[in-house]
Amino acid sequence: MSWTQENVDFLRGLGKRSITLNDYVKAYYDVEILPYDISLNPILQKVIDRVYEITKEAFDNPQHEYYYAPNRRINEYGNHVEDVLCQAIEDVDGTEAKNLGVGYPDVRTKLGGYFLYPECKISSNIDEVGSMRSFYTSVPAERTKKIKNLQDGMHILFKFHHNGPGVLTGRHKVFDLNGMQYVSEALQQGNDKNVYACKMLFG
């Protein structure tokens, strides 16, 4: 027999399930997502303004730290804008925006006495609400949990409108992710070591 009842029962319990981001951070980091505090509005607006200032300063200036060449891939521009956002936070508030590494959340800062976890996205059409995946989380390794060391805090998502690599148009949307619902899906994955450990029929 190549299956076990325990694994069968486990797999049958998996599948699509609607969860909240709050569930995710509580389950894996044992922390709470706090509702956005509107007292942060003025400083957040300054941060957004600074993002555009840095982008304009860097545009067409290859010597600038945040220059983004027009021939670079657009799907890497989102990570670049996130770096600009981190710099903008430091410029405006003097607070370090720390990169936490791969996996959600990947940036932490502190504004107005609150821990803030900003997520940054770009889009050529920020008014379009599509069904393509634009946000995801994954089960963190124990080492990742220790490195990220999450605290209770606010989780917000910046979505900037772009007109090609290196060009932000000045339009944006900012979302409070507290209570955000999304779908948890079971995923099984293997590699060639798993396959090659099987009985080979030809070859």
Stretches found by the model and what they are:
Residues M1-G103, L116, I122-G203:
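Nucleic-acid endonuclease domains
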Residues R108-Y117:
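Active-site beta-strand-loop-beta-strand hairpin of nuclease catalytic cores
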